[in-house]
Amino acid sequence: MLFRSAEAAGVDAIVAEGFEAGGHNGREETTTLCLIPAVRAVTSLPLIAAGGIATGEAILAMRALGAEGVQVGTRFALTEESSASEVFKEYCLHLKEGDTRLLLKKLSPVRLARGNFQQAVAAAEAVGATEEDLRILLSKGRAKRGIFEGDLEEGELEIGQASALLNEKGIQTVAEVMDELVTGYHRACETLAANVCERWDV
């Protein structure tokens, strides 16, 4: 694992990101749920979980798996303060489960939302596109066009699977998101303490 090299180099903490995350990703398709305990088992460094984390409940789950903290991307990418296009934000807030896919594994794996570009990449890969073919497909500033200019037709729409959890949220401020995450985390802690542990006689 790459984290071993990072640990040897003297880093202060490790960020372990599951393939639920938006944007560039690992080729292994390891979920955050499986990745965090695997990394926790072999390092004593502070561990920051990432990928698919958009609620307070998810934060508690990561803590239970051994992470000291979390990295949240999709939630904050869709806030008022984000520099992403408003068109991109609104589009992502209407995505459903299964609307994002991990593609471009021959180059640099990236999770993309449904749209013309995602379809074009999937079609190219299905017929055996070479690395050079894929580079040509990517060579038109696609990410900037999609995320920052709001080009939903030809742009690269990078966002995580957690977007499907945000359909009823609308565009929120960072403060509102933080309040929800903290409140949700504490509520989940209380629920776990009051119900699960007692029910399972732990």
Indicate where each model-derived feature is located:
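Short, small-residue-biased leader/transition segments that mark boundaries at the very start
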Residues: 1-2
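Acidic (Asp/Glu)-rich catalytic clusters
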Residues: 7-10
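Short, ordered loop/turn segments at secondary-structure junctions
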Residues: 18-20, 75
